[in-house]
């Protein structure tokens, strides 16, 4: 199954000059989505995760079905103020400002093997922040995984774990 053919590109979204890779068309095609989850399962299984963590919001769509396929738990990293109860947060720098990610304080047991997922690897900033946050609560982050990456942005350079990617766009 050619997963790439099920990902729509939208020029000038969310602003002029940006080419947006939209997975809505992939999600809408049951066989293509199933094949995507199966391929991710093959890539992630060797990292032996106890728990998958999805990054808000499309990372949830990737991590949740994959956790069922691999028989492991699922937790969420969200933007500040979106999770109930006690949370642990990490604030990181963006090109023009800062952002904050959070996880529930009891979401991860110390030493749990974790793979972090998102739909797209671009600059790597959000994933690097999520990995930092997860380690601060005791996770053993063994890998990051994505449906696709914009390889020309060199996001892998910001990660200190293996990055599993199904589709790489070179330009």
UniProtKB/Swiss-Prot annotation:
One of its GO terms (molecular function) is AMP binding. Its EC number is 2.4.2.7. InterPro entries: Ade_phspho_trans, PRibTrfase_dom, PRTase-like, UPRTase/APRTase. The keyword Cytoplasm applies. It is found in: Cytoplasm. Its main location: cytoplasm. It catalyses: AMP + diphosphate = 5-phospho-alpha-D-ribose 1-diphosphate + adenine. It is an enzyme of class 2 (transferase). Keywords: Cytoplasm, Glycosyltransferase, Purine salvage, Transferase. The keyword Transferase applies. It comes from the Bacteria. It holds the Pfam family Pribosyltran. One of its GO terms (cellular component) is cytoplasm. Homodimer. Catalyzes a salvage reaction resulting in the formation of AMP, that is energically less costly than de novo synthesis. NCBIfam families: apt (TIGR01090), PRK02304.1-3 (NF002634), PRK02304.1-5 (NF002636). Belongs to the purine/pyrimidine phosphoribosyltransferase family. This is Adenine phosphoribosyltransferase. It comes from Rhodospirillum centenum (strain ATCC 51521 / SW).
